[in-house]
UniProtKB/Swiss-Prot annotation:
Alphabetical list of InterPro entries matching this protein: AAA+_ATPase (IPR003593), ABC_transporter-like_ATP-bd (IPR003439), ABC_transporter-like_CS (IPR017871), ABC_transpr_MalK-like (IPR015855), ABC_transpr_MalK/UgpC-like (IPR047641), Mo/tungstate-bd_C_term_dom (IPR008995), NA-bd_OB-fold (IPR012340), OB_MalK-like (IPR040582)
Keyword annotations: ATP-binding, Cell inner membrane, Cell membrane, Membrane, Nucleotide-binding, Sugar transport, Translocase, Transport
GO molecular function (one): ABC-type glycerol-3-phosphate transporter activity
CDD domains in alphabetical order: ABC_MalK_N (cd03301)
Protein's name in the database: sn-glycerol-3-phosphate import ATP-binding protein UgpC
The EC number(s) this enzyme carries: 7.6.2.10
Annotated compartments: Cell inner membrane
Length: 356
């Protein structure tokens, strides 16, 4: 196994604008890190820099304690799995998996042993003589992973490998990737725009935005304690409710438009009188009663999802979404009385957007 270190790496195409701002990341031996963010945030560019397919403008990359910043891709000890399977259509599964080792001059016996072991791990034993056209999308992706596994790399790099699969296959392949990593324990860096993939696969998640690592943490950490408004709005489905307002002059309550006031769980006296953004996830809002101090919300629409429902309404000009139990189906125009637990409230600075 081998660790991976990015040390203040940057990328600029024109020498002026940095598409990757100075970024430092330490990936431990055997760790599975997922880089997630919207299109254009720099995650695939960063992955290609690690692979050696894009030059690093400044900073350094280390793999297995060796500086690889200027090394050719073939010398870095990495193997990539792409969104497109890139299999040779005229070759069998076995030949596709063996080809990279063959052109490196590895002996036939050793190649055969590695292909056999990778096929066993990926349950491709009975498909080795088939051509890619005879395989399903999931099987083709397994062959692409097998081609990477036989190289026995120090680091696996995954560039949105499940994007071409349908929803059912993506779920299946997520489970298979988890099992594969538990078995191989190879250091892995994985890129996706899909937060579900990020949360289910990662040991740690790096949320990227505009070439910046907004937050690096476990899936639980980025869900429970988002470091910024961007992370709060990106992680979670539906997204966290974000409500503009101000902390009252005593620092004890948060004041929203329309005269709605919510109690704060102490510790905010230093922010008294300041404009802030309050966040709460739809699943953390509970139904209450007017007599119990519930806050009213007139419901505009109801989304029935099956396992649960989403109620949509407004406080003034600000939208609010509440996740309801399956049996709760209020009608449009009805008033819901809500309880927002103090320990589930998040506050973000009104100017910087950072968590306070």
């Amino acid at each position: 196994m081998a660790g991976l270190k990015l040390q203040a790496v940057t990328k600029s195409w024109d020498g002026k604008t940095q598409v990757i701002k100075p970024l430092t990341l330490d990936v431990a031996d055997g760790e599975f890190i997922v880089m997630v963010g919207p299109s254009g945030c720099g995650k695939s560019t960063l992955l290609r820099m690690v692979a050696g397919l894009e030059r690093v403008t400044t900073g350094d990359i280390w793999i297995d304690r060796k500086r690889v910043t200027e090394m050719e891709p073939k010398d870095r000890g990495i193997a990539m799995v792409f969104q497109n399977y890139a299999l040779y259509p005229h070759m069998s599964v076995e030949e596709n998996m063996a080809w990279g080792l063959k052109i490196r001059g590895m002996g036939k016996q050793q190649i055969a042993e590695r292909v056999k072991e990778a096929a066993r791990i990926l349950e491709l034993d009975g498909l080795l003589k088939r051509r890619p056209r005879e395989l399903s999308g999931g099987q083709r992706q397994r062959v692409a992973m097998g081609r990477a596994i036989v190289r026995e790399p120090a680091v696996f790099l995954f560039d949105e490998p499940l994007s071409n699969l349908d929803a059912k296959l993506r779920v299946q392949m997520r489970l298979e990737l988890q099992q594969l990593h538990r078995r191989l324990k190879t250091t892995s860096l994985y890129v996706t725009h899909d937060q579900v993939e990020a949360m289910t696969l990662a040991q740690r998640v790096m949320v990227m935005n505009g070439g910046v690592a907004e937050q690096i943490g476990t899936p639980v950490e980025v869900y429970e304690k988002p470091a910024s408004l961007f992370v709060a709005s990106f992680i979670g489905s539906p997204a966290m409710n974000l409500l503009a307002g101000r902390v009252n002059n005593e620092g004890t309550h948060f004041e929203l438009d329309g005269g709605i006031t919510l109690p704060l769980n102490g510790g905010y006296r230093q922010y008294a009188g300041r404009k802030m953004t309050l966040g709460i996830r739809p699943e953390h809002i509970a139904l209450s009663l007017q007599a119990e101090g519930g806050v009213p919300l007139v419901m505009d629409t109801l989304e029935i999802l099956g396992a649960d429902n989403l109620a949509h309404g407004r406080w003034g000009e600000q939208k609010l979404v509440v996740r309801l139990a399956h049996q709760e189906r209020p009608t449009a125009g009805s008033t819901l009385w809500l309880h927002l637990p103090e320990n589930q409230l998040h506050l973000f600075d009104g100017e910087t957007g950072q968590r306070v």
